[in-house]
């Protein structure tokens, strides 16, 4: 799969951490030093961890799994939405709704309501209502779409979550950990990398850095999908195998006019 280089990370500002006074001790192994009271992240540590995380995302996509892209902070919203849509994965870019994972059944009911309102707006139902009713329903639809539009096709819990800022998305990460859902996340110098399954030490604020992470994640997903076995060919192979097994257990019928072998005479 395409690998992100150290030069690309340097150009995107991935190596710039937070102010030294806000650092988390568990990030010490990933910190190269400090410059002007700002911690500098050791990209020699980041690059292999980043590529490992991307390989993991690709492996999930290859198994036809679902990865939820999560980035609700202002600097992450546009990139997360764009790249998630590009690779066909669900996303959340507005405020995380508590219980999105742990109370998924209720969330699915809200998604069903959103789809119902979208259908009503296009099938002529709204045309039969008075103006104030239409305005009320449209406001409801817009509110639901803003919070749940990115996950309306996510019919089950995701197989993993890709997160930009673990401090900003702490509730989502707690829900994922409670349910045993793997978390792949960018972790800046001010947070604990041990809170996630695949930590990517790096700047979680710079727009260019976020674009790099999101684009690479989407590329990994697309590559995994491309490597997934074709369902039609899998069924064809299974059918061929079953036919071969059945053929082994059958005896070819005797040709016309050919006598069957006589049974051995009893002694």
Swiss-Prot record:
InterPro entries: Ribosomal_uS2, Ribosomal_uS2_bac/mit/plastid, Ribosomal_uS2_CS, Ribosomal_uS2_flav_dom_sf. GO terms for molecular function: structural constituent of ribosome. Keywords: Ribonucleoprotein, Ribosomal protein. Residues 226-267 are annotated as: Disordered. Gene3D superfamilies: Glucose-6-phosphate isomerase like protein, domain 1, Helix hairpin bin. Belongs to the universal ribosomal protein uS2 family. It comes from the Bacteria. Disulfide bonds: none annotated. This is Small ribosomal subunit protein uS2. It comes from Xanthomonas oryzae pv. oryzae (strain KACC10331 / KXO85). Residues 245-267 have a biased composition (Basic and acidic residues).
């Amino acid at each position: 799969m395409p690998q992100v280089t150290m030069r690309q990370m340097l150009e995107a500002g991935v190596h710039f951490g937070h102010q030294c006074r806000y650092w988390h001790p568990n990030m010490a192994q990933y910190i190269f030093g400090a410059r002007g009271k700002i911690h500098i992240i050791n990209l020699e540590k980041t690059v292999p961890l980043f590529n490992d995380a991307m390989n993991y995302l690709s492996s999930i996509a290859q198994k036809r799994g679902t990865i939820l892209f999560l980035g609700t902070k202002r600097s992450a919203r546009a990139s997360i939405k764009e790249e998630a849509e590009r690779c066909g994965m669900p996303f959340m870019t507005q405020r995380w709704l508590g219980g999105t994972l742990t109370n998924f059944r209720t969330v699915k009911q809200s998604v069903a309501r959103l789809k119902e309102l979208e259908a009503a707006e296009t099938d002529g139902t709204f045309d039969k209502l008075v103006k104030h009713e239409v305005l009320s329903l449209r406001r409801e639809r817009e509110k639901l779409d803003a919070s749940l539009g990115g996950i309306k096709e996510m019919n089950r819990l995701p197989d993993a979550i890709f997160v930009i800022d673990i401090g900003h998305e702490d509730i989502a990460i707690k829900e994922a950990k409670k349910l045993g859902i793997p978390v792949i996340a960018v972790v800046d110098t001010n947070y604990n990398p041990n809170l996630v399954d695949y930590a990517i030490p790096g700047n979680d604020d710079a727009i260019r850095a976020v674009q790099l992470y999101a684009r690479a994640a989407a590329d990994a997903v697309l590559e995994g999908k491309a490597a997934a076995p074709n369902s039609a060919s899998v069924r064809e192979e299974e059918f061929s195998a079953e036919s071969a097994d059945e053929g082994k257990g059958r005896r070819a019928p005797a040709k016309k006019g050919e006598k069957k072998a006589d049974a051995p005479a009893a002694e």
